[in-house]
């Protein structure tokens, strides 16, 4: 076995990103690397309990003591000689972790890959496996379950090829904050460092225009990262005394909290940013060409029967429902409004796991931690369990409105083949429930009740999931179902982004040679295209920013008008953008 001594610090990192393996810090089962790798495989989550607990812990905010005094601002309370009362706050942690989303901050996932490449080399087998992870990431909806799985499998892939030979592991890197879940989200789902289409699926730039396309895509990337960063930073204000103000927030001319200044400036130009990477704009669309959304809808209709036939023939094991259980574990009490025994059990399990990991590993994880995060490993620090695993969520915001949350439980179900079809049938049943003019919202509860009576649920393929699907739907609540299926733009794009052919119709370990050839072809082709153009994503993130940071009615009206025009060009129909903007989040 080759042995490598780690350097401190490593190139591009303030602290070592990987650590030397010991019997206590890798945690992999003996058979973890024995089978061929398939990306987004819920069975892999059972191969390392230590890593699972680490990622769950790393998805929570950290509280540290801070001084406050009633009727004194944050800046004044820091002055010498002021007798301050101590309280706990997540503000400092949020501000440190939020720096990951700065435009001029290097991608630490890319830096990690470059470090491994220079120190150990990248084998063709690793490249093929990583290509499958990237391809399925582009075909998945942005949600907490997908982000958790991407982080877990990134560590899995690196350890699969480098743990045994070089005695190094990435297990522990998230707990030590040398990597963060925001790094994973940025690399795989926000900037998407491996994407090759410049944000315009199926459209090749004219010769000589490649540089301009990269600049346009960078502007899009800055915009969506600014929205997520602003949403994250706004969490800290909810824990402060009302008399305190944060330097990064201000009151704009509308008289309403506008969010951090970079976001306010970005929102003012969202339409120009979107137009440059919108496949429906006159600059990119030629006569007879369908938009990305129209193409995705057409492909989904064609593939549904193919997937049903596939599910009829396949024998599913218990691990197939792993992502449903993961969704309940991560989002119970966070994105749910109705409580039952399963959701209560999930909350207790999650909180217990986070606290146990912190108590057992705090001292170990304080070694080699980056300097700016050292204070968050002290005895006085502790995980903030009230917000749940918020760093895994798409928008990282704690707002609730109209019995909805910024993170959607139903989006998480799109990663499961059975549930992808079940949600489509569920929507059809709601639409067909009444032959009269009964509102769509009023049709939801009766359909939920009808599906609850069927055990197992009667579909065109075996669907005995032991009640998981209907449990999650009930826990989310009728408002969240209405928002997901008919109202919310981010949910609509998550459905369009989900590519069932890539997620569910690839070769399996039943024919390993075909599987390995498939992965090798993905790597050789190096064609990683999204399913939804970056212009639509710009609109979706702008919509979320308007929900989280309300504007004046005149600004809202202009935004709804411009956004509605773009949706019509893409043939996307949603119920009342005005209602969704003001009543949901």
Swiss-Prot record:
Signal peptide (from-to): none
Binding site for Zn(2+) 2: 408, 411, 484, 491
Cellular component aspect of the GO annotation: host cell cytoplasm; host cell nucleus; viral envelope
Gene Ontology MF terms: zinc ion binding
Localisation per UniProt entry: Host cytoplasm; Host nucleus
Swiss-Prot/TrEMBL keywords: Host cytoplasm, Host nucleus, Metal-binding, Zinc, Zinc-finger
Name this protein carries in UniProt: Packaging protein UL32
Origin species: Varicella-zoster virus (strain Dumas) (HHV-3)
């Amino acid at each position: 076995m080759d042995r490598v001594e780690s350097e401190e610090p490593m190139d591009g990192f303030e602290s070592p990103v990987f650590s030397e393996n010991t019997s206590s810090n890798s945690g992999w089962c003996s058979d973890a690397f024995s089978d061929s790798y398939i990306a987004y495989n819920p069975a892999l989550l059972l191969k390392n309990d230590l890593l699972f607990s680490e990622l769950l812990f790393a998805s929570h905010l950290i509280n540290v003591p801070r001084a406050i005094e009633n009727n004194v601002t944050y800046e004044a309370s820091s002055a010498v000689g002021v007798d301050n009362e101590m309280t706990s706050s997540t503000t400092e942690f949020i501000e440190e972790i939020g720096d990951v989303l700065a435009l001029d901050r290097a991608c630490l996932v890319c830096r990690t890959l470059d470090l491994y490449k220079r120190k150990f080399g990248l084998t063709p087998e690793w490249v093929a496996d990583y290509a499958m992870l990237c391809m399925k990431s582009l075909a998945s909806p942005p949600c907490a379950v997908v982000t958790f799985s991407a982080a877990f499998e990134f560590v899995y892939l690196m350890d699969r090829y480098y743990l045994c030979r070089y005695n190094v592991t990435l297990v522990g890197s998230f707990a030590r904050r040398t990597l963060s879940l925001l790094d994973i989200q940025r690399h795989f789902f926000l900037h998407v460092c491996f994407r090759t289409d410049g944000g315009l699926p199926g459209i090749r730039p004219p010769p000589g225009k490649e540089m301009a396309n990269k600049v346009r895509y960078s502007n899009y990337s800055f915009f969506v990262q600014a929205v997520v960063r602003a949403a994250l930073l706004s969490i800290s204000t909810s824990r402060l005394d009302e008399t305190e103000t944060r330097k990064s927030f201000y009151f704009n001319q509308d008289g309403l909290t506008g969010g951090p200044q970079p976001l306010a400036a970005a929102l003012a130009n969202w339409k120009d940013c979107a137009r440059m990477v919108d496949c429906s704009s006159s600059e990119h669309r030629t006569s007879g060409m369908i938009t990305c959304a129209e193409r995705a809808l057409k492909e989904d209709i064609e593939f549904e029967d193919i997937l049903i036939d596939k599910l009829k023939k396949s024998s599913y094991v218990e691990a197939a429902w792993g992502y449903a259980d993961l969704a309940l574990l991560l989002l119970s009490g966070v994105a749910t409004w109705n409580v039952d025994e399963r959701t209560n059990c999930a909350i207790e399990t999650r909180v217990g796991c986070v606290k146990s990991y912190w108590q057992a590993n705090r001292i170990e994880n304080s070694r080699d931690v980056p300097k700016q995060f050292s204070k968050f490993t002290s005895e006085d620090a502790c995980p903030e369990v009230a917000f749940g695993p918020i760093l895994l969520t798409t928008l990282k915001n704690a707002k609730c409105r109209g019995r909805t949350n910024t993170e959607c439980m139903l989006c998480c179900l799109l990663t499961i083949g059975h549930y992808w079809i079940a949600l489509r049938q569920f929507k059809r049943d709601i639409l067909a429930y009444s032959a009269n003019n009964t509102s769509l919202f009023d049709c939801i509860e009766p359909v939920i009740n009808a599906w609850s009576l069927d055990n197992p649920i009667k579909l065109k393929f075996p669907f005995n999931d032991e009640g998981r699907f209907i449990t999650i739907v009930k826990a989310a609540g009728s408002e969240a179902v209405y928002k997901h299926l008919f109202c919310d733009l981010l949910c609509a794009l998550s459905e369009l982004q989900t590519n069932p052919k890539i997620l569910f119709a690839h070769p399996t370990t039943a024919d390993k040679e075909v599987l390995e050839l498939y992965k090798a072809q993905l790597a050789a082709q190096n064609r990683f295209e999204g399913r939804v153009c970056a212009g639509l994503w710009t609109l979706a993130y702008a919509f979320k920013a308007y929900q989280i940071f309300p504007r004046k009615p005149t600004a809202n009206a202009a935004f709804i008008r411009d956004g509605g025009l773009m949706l019509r060009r893409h043939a996307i129909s949603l119920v009342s953008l005005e209602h969704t903007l003001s009543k949901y989040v």
